[in-house]
Amino acid sequence: MDKIFESLYKAGCDVRMFEKLSCHTSIKIGGRVKYLVLPNDVFSLERAITVLKDFPFQIMGLGTNLLVQDEDLDIAVLKTERLNQIEIKGEKVLVESGTPLKRLCLFLMEAELGGLEFAYGIPGSVGGAIFMNAGAYGGEIGEFIEAVEVLKDGRKIWLSKNEIFFGYRDSTFKREKLIITRAMMSFKKEKKETIKAKMEDYMRRRLEKQPLDLPSAGSVFKRPREDFYVGKAIESLGLKGYRIGGAQISEKHAGFIVNTGSATFDDVMKLIEFVRKKVKEKYGVELETEVEIWWNGRQW
């Protein structure tokens, strides 16, 4: 038996060899990975990282803001979807990193804790959202963080909010490549009916404006400044519906690239670079990608 496979299994993880990541990303693109590792709890995640100390690995939440190369990757991917426990402590909530944001929002609604309604419908995990400081409709997840537990140099440590930097789609965790395991978040009491109404309103807006019927990796580009709307800029260039191979600029929202059924990593990357070039020519603005890209087993 493969020694790394055996050690990961003994560490309390389920392990799949040569698993296609296209089955684990929302855009349905991605080659085979040598080890797909599913830790069953925070402790098995810790042990898995120890096993992989001399083998390259990446952390994956729900794969919703991720673009992965088509070629096989000689790495391990630790997918945190089973780290999904939520514990309420008054007006504070302790939540594990693999918890889907939607599930956390529904939990908060039942507990009558308000504030995170804007995140209902964002399809990622709590850990991924904290990592990139996800936000929508004027809210960002970093506003609700009291402390975050991370794995750093083989040790579990808690960082308080005063030790954490949050910026626009940016954070300490992203800059320092820290592995998020749990977060303590703080909310305010709110009536269930009010929370539900807000969540339904945000979801209605998403359904109206975003291409939720086709595979995508979410919003592709960061907004370069507050008054520059990327989707509108791309639309003004007449690029809605423009496609390269199976990758297409969404006809519903030009800030999204969708997989029409046969898109490859190269199709999407070429389309990203084409859009960046056209926006630079017209507006003099350099677009940065919001989507995380794995190429040659590393973040691009």
UniProtKB/Swiss-Prot annotation:
Q: Which reaction does it catalyse?
A: UDP-N-acetyl-alpha-D-muramate + NADP(+) = UDP-N-acetyl-3-O-(1-carboxyvinyl)-alpha-D-glucosamine + NADPH + H(+)
Which residues carry out catalysis? R169, S219 (proton donor), E290
Please verify whether the record's keywords include Cell division.
yes
Q: Which GO terms describe its cellular component?
A: cytosol
Query: Pathway of this protein?
Result: Cell wall biogenesis; peptidoglycan biosynthesis
Task: Tell me the cofactors it needs.
Answer: FAD
Entry keywords, A to Z:
Cell cycle, Cell division, Cell shape, Cell wall biogenesis/degradation, Cytoplasm, FAD, Flavoprotein, NADP, Oxidoreductase, Peptidoglycan synthesis
List the GO molecular function terms. FAD binding; UDP-N-acetylmuramate dehydrogenase activity
Q: Which PROSITE patterns match?
A: FAD_PCMH
A GO BP entry is: peptidoglycan biosynthetic process
Cell location: Cytoplasm
**Superkingdom of the organism of origin:** Bacteria
Q: Which parts of the sequence belong to the FAD-binding PCMH-type domain?
A: 28-190
Entry's EC annotation: 1.3.1.98
Oxidoreductase in keyword set:
yes
Read off the NCBIfam families from this record. murB, PRK13905.1
| Family recorded in the similarity comment | Belongs to the MurB family.
Described by its record, this protein's role is as follows: Cell wall formation.
What's the protein name?
UDP-N-acetylenolpyruvoylglucosamine reductase
State the species of origin. Thermotoga sp. (strain RQ2)
UniProt gene name: murB
